[in-house]
Amino acid sequence: MERLLIVNADDFGLSKGQNYGIIEACRNGIVTSTTALVNGQAIDHAVQLSRDEPSLAIGMHFVLTMGKPLTAMPGLTRDGVLGKWIWQLAEEDALPLEEITQELASQYLRFIELFGRKPTHLDSHHHVHMFPQIFPIVARFAAEEGIALRADRQMVFDLPVNLRTTQGFSSAFYGEEISESLFLQVLDDSSHRGERSLEVMCHPAFIDNTIRQSAYCFPRLTELDVLTSASLKYAIAERGYRLGSYLDV
């Protein structure tokens, strides 16, 4: 039985090093899809690079934890910027859901402005769309717009009937122990669960000053090495997986 594998590189637009890494992993590796931060400091650079890589499917990486929002968000920003205090607000059930709804729509329109088309799918920076308060907003929006959504079914809530997503999602290809065997273990675990479609999240990058400031720095370069390995591509095919994107879901 053929299975669909989507290898999605998060953080397109975060920095030039991140952008170049994603393009390299697509051009010479197994990355088939990426998600773009429309408020990222290198988003214009990402748009420019993407024009030469038409095979790369591009979705939207909804941002509520970094940089400046596109709309006024007094209930979520501090000194005009977004940050990781969103977790505290979520725990206190104090998220400004109307502001978040408006910001989602604005980032979506900005994506279309930048790339000239709808995103293939939605996910989010730091998985904030999986917060119980936020997920229904994003799921409803994706269903209404006819685009797919990353959904971790181990956490997921009720899905709209017409919402497209994969049967499986894994964030396990992450951390200090990145290797080809780890990636293949993710596939084998999915196969054992009987999933016919799987998204694997990744963050391949070259190191630049922005990436150096990230808590997750040098493993991004290791990811790039693994994802561009010829032996990995062969092993994926051997396991009955076909590389694709959310357009295939």
Swiss-Prot record:
GO biological process, alphabetically ordered: chitin catabolic process; diacetylchitobiose catabolic process; polysaccharide catabolic process
One GO term describing the cellular component: cytoplasm
Location within or outside the cell: Cytoplasm
Pathway terms, separated by semicolons: Glycan degradation; chitin degradation
Listed Pfam families: YdjC (PF04794)
Keywords: Carbohydrate metabolism, Chitin degradation, Cytoplasm, Hydrolase, Magnesium, Metal-binding, Polysaccharide degradation
Family affiliation: Belongs to the YdjC deacetylase family. ChbG subfamily.
HAMAP family assigned: COD
Subunit structure as annotated in this protein's UniProt entry: Homodimer.
Database matches in NCBIfam families: PRK02134.1
The name this protein goes by in its record: Chitooligosaccharide deacetylase
Species this protein is from: Escherichia coli (strain SMS-3-5 / SECEC)
